[in-house]
Curated annotation (Swiss-Prot):
Signal peptide stretch: none
The protein's annotated pathway: Cofactor biosynthesis; (R)-pantothenate biosynthesis; (R)-pantoate from 3-methyl-2-oxobutanoate: step 1/2
Reactions it catalyzes: 3-methyl-2-oxobutanoate + (6R)-5,10-methylene-5,6,7,8-tetrahydrofolate + H2O = 2-dehydropantoate + (6S)-5,6,7,8-tetrahydrofolate
Top-level taxonomic group: Bacteria
Protein name: 3-methyl-2-oxobutanoate hydroxymethyltransferase
Subcellular location(s) of the protein: Cytoplasm
InterPro entries for this protein: Pantoate_hydroxy_MeTrfase, Pyrv/PenolPyrv_kinase-like_dom, Pyrv_kinase-like_dom_sf
Entry GO MF terms: 3-methyl-2-oxobutanoate hydroxymethyltransferase activity; magnesium ion binding
Binding site for 3-methyl-2-oxobutanoate: 49-50, 88, 118
Cofactors named for this entry: Mg(2+)
Binding annotation for Mg(2+): 49, 88, 120
Subunit description: Homodecamer; pentamer of dimers.
Organism: Nitrobacter winogradskyi (strain ATCC 25391 / DSM 10237 / CIP 104748 / NCIMB 11846 / Nb-255)
Cofactor stoichiometry and binding remark: Binds 1 Mg(2+) ion per subunit.
Amino acid sequence: MSVQSAIRRRTAPDIRARKNGDPIVMLTSYHAHTAALVDRYCDVILVGDSLGNVMHGFETTVPVTLDMMILQGRAVMRGSQQALVVVDMPFGSYEASKEQAFHSAARLLKETLCGAVKLEGGVKMAETIAFLSARGIPVMGHVGLTPQSINTLGSFRAQGREEGTWQPIEDDARAVAEAGAFSMVIEAVAEPLARRITETVAIPTIGIGASPACDGQVLVLEDMLGLSPRAPKFVRRYGELGPMIEAAIEGYARDVRSRAFPGPEHVYAMKPKS
């Protein structure tokens, strides 16, 4: 048996069992190399549709396609061994009907070999979540700020910060949990509301701009590494790789133009005659 096959990958039931337990650590990844690094420390790797922003420069996640998610999901699965890999269902791949959602989710599982899918929406998507869950597809929910709805929302502002706005978000969270999701992301929601949802739903909550009381946390990898020029309020920078990478590229360009690179140690000499 190979070393890789001997390593047990985390599953959706493993994450479901972490409710009120040790905090769940989750980060995004879109490449095999970063997936290998993230895999060492994280319980869950999210192949997020945020790849549209990070990799392709889109202003929103709306243009992301199912084929794009499959391509990067495959890369992350090849680069990781231990973490549960969850792949986002992109806008337009699941909203039309339960059947459309099943066919899209089945493609994601079959073609990437990931362990679960994530979709946005609460009450309106509960029937779809139940349909998928009953057919062997683990679903991670996503409530609060739902970026795929940007054209309806108008902006990426935090939710539940005004009195009288909590009930719809609570209803969404409850509907997702009762429909059979194994966990849910709570994004950009007022801290007291995120805390209350975490205390009342039976499945783990994973916060992003939510509350330290959530059962876990997630960030976009490039945001926390300092690779994004701008980051939301809820991001803590754990590195400043952007300036480091720029300095390295500047040094490379300088050495090429001055012919300092390549040096003698970087080129191949002729083999001696026998």
